[in-house]
Amino acid sequence: MMAKKPPKPAPRRIFQERLKITALPLYFEGFLLVKRSDHQEYKHYWTELRGTTLFFYTDKKSTIYVGKLDIIDLVCLTGQHSTEKNCAKFTLVLPKEEVHVKTENTESGEEWRGFILTVTELTVPQHVSLLPGQVIRLHEVLEREKKRRIETDQLPLMPPEKEKEPVQDYADVLNPLPECFYAVSRKEATAMLEKNPSWGNMILRPGSDSKNYSITIRQEIEMPRIKHFKVTRTGNNYTIELEKPVTLPNLFSVIDYFVKETRGNLRPFIHSADDNFGQDPNIEDRSEKFKKNPHNA
């Protein structure tokens, strides 16, 4: 059964972790029963609306989401008649699927509808039954979302060019590249880590396919070992190809994942501008071109 009392906000530590992982502002949260197109039954999630994405957690205390739903292309939100007492039902109609949602009570159902329509339509809906204070919150969220989209250059997005150089696959205007990114080969990355271990032991570099990324690390457990991990771009996210793949929202989160999972044993490889690599002097120039202007690098 769903909770009858309004849930309390997540503790500050959990909030900060989720903010860091999702890299999106929190607009609304609460319990939802969700049925995706590939599910037969509803699943119970603690749900957060961040930006124009719904993040699903197994419970209030989880910091890692188990699923997410991008609703920026929402076609419409349709209400459903519910035979269950104190329960609101509606459907999120998206271009490629329909997602059925149930809320814990009719009031929270109106709030969810209000916030979802506000961030997707960029206007406060007039046909929701909310209290004055709740409507004020919608206007505040509307201004925050407009500002966020302007800052991330998402309003509007220009269609991609038909022809482009392979190097443009590294363009990440919305998420600048981490400091430990270097436009080097696997061999060069290995040499950098071996020659300058005091600067760090983890490098982010272009993948061998010129479309994705790779991470090269140097670990010293008994004896130095070099390992390479492929990081594949999947839509707006990045997937680390491990035994159990891990998907994260940006490259900064990818680096943070390795640092946290090794309890700080892996550190980003960062050098001073005054230091000398002792290798190809063009490496630094190439990396800066990728970071500042990847289209022309």
UniProtKB/Swiss-Prot annotation:
InterPro entries: PH-like_dom_sf, PH_domain, SH2, SH2_dom_sf, STAP1/STAP2, STAP1_SH2. It is found in: Nucleus; Cytoplasm; Mitochondrion. GO terms for molecular function: macrophage colony-stimulating factor receptor binding; phosphotyrosine residue binding; protein tyrosine kinase activator activity; protein-macromolecule adaptor activity; receptor tyrosine kinase binding; transmembrane receptor protein tyrosine kinase adaptor activity. The modification Phosphotyrosine is found at Y170. Residues 25-121 form the PH domain. SMART domains: PH (SM00233), SH2 (SM00252). One of its GO terms (cellular component) is mitochondrion. Keywords: Cytoplasm, Mitochondrion, Nucleus, Phosphoprotein, SH2 domain. Residues 271-297 are annotated as: Disordered. GO terms for biological process: cell surface receptor protein tyrosine kinase signaling pathway; cellular response to lipopolysaccharide; myeloid cell differentiation; negative regulation of macrophage chemotaxis; negative regulation of macrophage colony-stimulating factor signaling pathway; negative regulation of microglial cell migration; negative regulation of ruffle assembly; positive regulation of B cell receptor signaling pathway. This is Signal-transducing adaptor protein 1. Phosphorylated on tyrosine by TEC. Phosphorylated on tyrosine by KIT. Its main location: nucleus. SUPFAM superfamilies: PH domain-like, SH2 domain. Residues 179-273 form the SH2 domain. Transmembrane segments: none annotated. It holds the Pfam family SH2.
